[in-house]
Amino acid sequence: MEQFSQMIADALKLPVHRVENTLKLLQGGATIPFISRYRKEATGGLDEVQISEISSRYEKLLELSKRKETIQSTIESLGKLTDDLRRRIDGCWDATELEDIYLPYKPKRKTRAEAARQKGLEPLAAWLMLQRGNALDAYVKNFVKGEVKNEEDALKGARDIIAEQVNEDEQARNQIRHQFSRQAVISAKVVKGKETDEAAAKYRDYFDFSEPLKRCSSHRLLAIRRGEAEGILKVSITPSDETECTDRLERRFVRGNNECSRQVCEAVNDAYKRLLKPAIETEFAALSKEKADDEAIRVFAGNLRQLLLAPPLGQKRVLGIDPGFRTGCKVVCLDAQGTLLHNEAIYPHPPKYEYQLAGRKLVKLVEQYRIEAIAIGNGTASRETEQFVTSQRFDREIQVFVVSEDGASIYSASKTARDEFPDYDVTVRGAVSIGRRLMDPLAELVKIDAKSIGVGQYQHDVDQTKLKEALDQTVESCVNLVGVNVNTASSHLLTYVSGLGPVLAKNIVDYRTANGPFRSRRELLKVPRMGAKAFEQCAGFLRIPHAENPLDNSAVHPESYPIVERMAADLHCSVSDLIANRELRSRISPEKYVTDTVGLPTLTDILQELEKPGRDPRQKIQVFEFDKNVRTIDDVQEGMELPGIVTNITNFGCFVDLGIKEKGLIHVSQLADRFVSDPTTVVSIHQHVRVRVIGVDRERKRIALTMKGM
């Protein structure tokens, strides 16, 4: 591990001891949120992103180390592992370089070169490589026998052997790699006969496309690759000047100008076209795809984080509406804990159009269930339903919110929803999800596959394993940042708490159901399979409101309770008094409580937490209203200034909900009156923005927006 620690430290420009300590904690079973929050002294205050990067790099080095062992074992079994070769493999920590070293020894399917060797042509190839003279015809005749029919057959076989040697030459591969890295151009052409396909229309921009690979943005590259996968586009990656590639190879392998050197020259050109170029093109295609995947996953994870940390309404009685025309609007009433109290359908819109009756029912439900806020899904009939709701006269002031439905239909048909509401249909479950999403977006969204939430960029085209890891890590980070009420949380939410997972999460809910609410964090140790390690990892992130010890409802870890108790004792007060009295807290000198294991970073966190125990880091929710005059894309006119909500962020800009079916696009160049390279520095998911319409394409259902000058 020491060697890996040093390599990671060098790559990330971090002191090696911080990397070593982080790796020890990770290998000891500590989670990233726990290390980031409660082990700052060990890591020097590394954040979750840095800890995750250390973990990722360690896993890659471990994988590479195993690959090296496999390669050495294979070469040794061939009897070709020299001391020099072993040293080269041991000292290699670059995956591409390692495979280049291995290539000459790698078991191959039967190649043209191997077939030529079996015909006894290897000595001819070796003689040609000497490039000493012109007595070619006489020498070649010696090899015309057996399966070799004539001189040309012999020369062709010898050239095949030379071509393979050129292909397996490390320096040659690096030369071509260098040319690709400097000059690679990605080109796309429409497949002949596909121009008029309906599916091809969205790839029209790439029918005759060419761009330097290093300048090709991730969203363009993923779009091109999707077009290729669908059989619409033919894609290639080549250096802009291929002559320079062959010239470099000729300078390396061809000497003089005689009959032999001309044969070598021909073999070198064949090696480039048939072997080297396709291999390096495949390599660069994979590398560029991996880079595009990483960028798309980064954007998706960032969007998901903002969505999960959206402002919650909190524990209030909510009426949720899943709007619709023909099937009506499904209405549910929820108590402050999100429990379903009532459901029914109303029909305020055509074709039934029971407007007055629907209004009376709605007013009665608001009064009967003492509703404090109404959540309306943003799908079909959303604007009409919002207008219907806001036109009613309630007996109290009711806040009305439009809530994203993305993923609600998937949740309503899921096993999770069926287990939760076995006696209700999908429409009721969907309306409940909409209402709960207003109360606590994080608690509700964790029940839905993150890929279904609709804030990704080509999420189905990227590496699915890496995507799942990134999204799971994002959910885990958000859940632990906010903290979880152990007495109300679902098993889905508890699953993402540091140190728990599905089994312990279910055990906690089962214990709670059987024994009533938890009264202290220590009681968690009575949960089946809750060991000391799991308790250490989860305790600080679980909250117990109204606990006897107020610290149980804070982010102060139980291991630090003695420190807080000592602070209170030194001030001759109780822990409750210390939390309630700012003047008492101001008299604390954190330096006084520093020990070998607890430093100022932890003490600073403790004092901040005592100011507002269990505080929610999410912002306060705000009511938003769309322009009442805009109901469809036909109402949108160039020059209009409209309110909107950012719903998705990509590399090329962001999409904005204007309260109609079609989302508007603010291109990255229109986000601000300055150059913007990263849209996330200007906008965030759910941000309320004011935009101006700069283009409407009703045929293609596209709306172009700007924030410049707004």
Task: Set out the residue ranges of the language-model regions.
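Structured, non-catalytic alpha/beta "coupling" segments that mediate domain-domain communication
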Residues: 74, 88, 98-102, 227-240, ...
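Short beta-alpha junctions and helix-cap segments that line functional grooves
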Residues: 318-320, 330, 386-389, 520-523, ...
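Duplex nucleic acid-engaging cores and interfaces of nucleic-acid transaction enzymes
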Residues: 50-53, 60, 64-320, 326-412, ...
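Short, ordered loop/turn segments at secondary-structure junctions
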Residues: 38-40, 129, 240, 323, ...
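Single-stranded RNA-binding regions, centering on S1/OB-family and related RNA-binding modules
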Residues: 544-710
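Long, highly charged, low-complexity intrinsically disordered interaction regions
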Residues: 4, 56, 63-80, 90, ...
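A glycine-rich phosphate-binding loop feature that marks nucleotide/adenosyl-phosphate handling sites
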Residues: 178-185, 321-325, 379-384, 403-410, ...
